[in-house]
Every structure is written in structure tokens, then in C-alpha cells.
């Protein structure tokens, strides 16, 4: 066996925060990775495949504004060889009819439109604060006034998340 994934898309578990901001499922996944390493040996690549909204960090809904890079201890563990991201991020915000914010593009399936939303669009340049905002297409820009690190808040900014990992 050349590779083994110890789990996938456990967002509901990996984001449970315990005492002292420890994430118990992440601790358990590190332990599991070490056990799998013993069983499968050094030649087998081991990883975890995070949900696209889980890989970069955890943003608690406690008004603190504090992000937690809760999976970093797993990603940096000696028993982990690869980071998997189950990547099905939004590629468009297309609406039926001619009256919507993306209507200036020729069509939902236009390659340039779709490309522009890989490192752009929802989850990169802007987000919706609520279901009502989504329905009305009230887009809130993603910024970071405190540290000029907007990538922290952009779920689609894999390039800068990875660059900051160093």
C-alpha cells in the first residue's frame, strides 16, 4: 500500500474545542496517525483529507474574532505525509435571469468566469453574512484590518495559506 488516509471531512469533530483551546479530535488523529505509521511502515504515505471549509482553520462564533489553526498540529505531525483537501468550494454565484451581480459574464459555464472564481469570488474576495444577504447578493469584502492578512479569512486562498505555513 503506497498511501493511506486516516479520515476525511470530520469538521464536526475536529472543531470541538476543549480546555486550554485544545482540540481533542486533532490530538486523537495524531495518535491514530502514529499507530497507522507503525502498522503500515515508513514507505506508506499517511494523511488526513479535510473538508474545504475545515482545512485552513476554525473561526468560532464567539465574537472574539480569533482564528484557530486547529489542524496545524496534525499537518505538522511527523506521522503525516500529506494534506488532503476535499475541495468543492463555490465556483460561481450565478442566478437565473439577467438581474444578478455576475450577469456581465456571458454564461455560468464560461471558462473565464469559472477561472476567475478559483482565486476570486465567494470565499476569496467576499462572503455573505447571512442567508438574507445571500438572497439579496449583499457581498461583504473579506479583509483583515488588524494584520493585513486577508488569507486568514479566505477559505479559498490555498496559495497564501500554504505560503504562510513556512
Regions found by a protein language model. Give the residues of each.
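Noncatalytic carbohydrate-binding groove/subsite architecture in carbohydrate-active enzymes
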Residues: 1-2, 8-166
Amino acid at each position: 500500500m503506497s498511501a493511506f488516509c486516516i479520515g476525511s471531512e470530520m469538521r464536526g469533530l475536529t472543531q470541538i474545542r476543549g480546555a486550554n483551546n485544545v482540540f481533542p479530535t486533532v490530538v486523537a488523529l495524531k495518535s491514530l496517525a502514529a499507530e497507522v505509521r507503525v502498522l503500515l511502515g515508513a514507505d506508506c504515505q499517511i494523511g488526513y483529507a479535510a473538508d474545504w471549509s475545515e482545512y485552513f482553520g476554525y473561526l468560532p462564533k464567539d465574537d472574539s474574532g480569533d482564528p484557530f489553526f486547529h489542524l496545524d498540529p496534525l499537518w505538522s505531525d511527523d506521522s503525516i505525509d500529506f494534506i488532503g483537501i476535499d475541495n468543492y468550494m463555490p465556483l460561481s454565484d450565478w442566478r437565473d435571469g439577467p438581474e444578478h451581480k455576475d450577469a456581465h459574464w456571458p454564461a455560468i459555464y464560461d471558462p473565464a468566469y469559472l477561472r476567475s472564481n478559483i482565486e476570486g469570488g465567494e470565499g476569496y474576495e467576499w462572503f455573505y453574512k447571512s442567508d438574507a444577504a445571500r438572497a439579496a447578493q449583499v457581498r461583504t469584502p473579506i479583509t483583515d484590518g488588524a494584520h493585513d492578512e486577508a488569507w486568514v479569512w479566505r477559505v479559498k486562498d490555498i496559495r497564501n495559506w500554504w505560503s504562510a505555513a513556512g
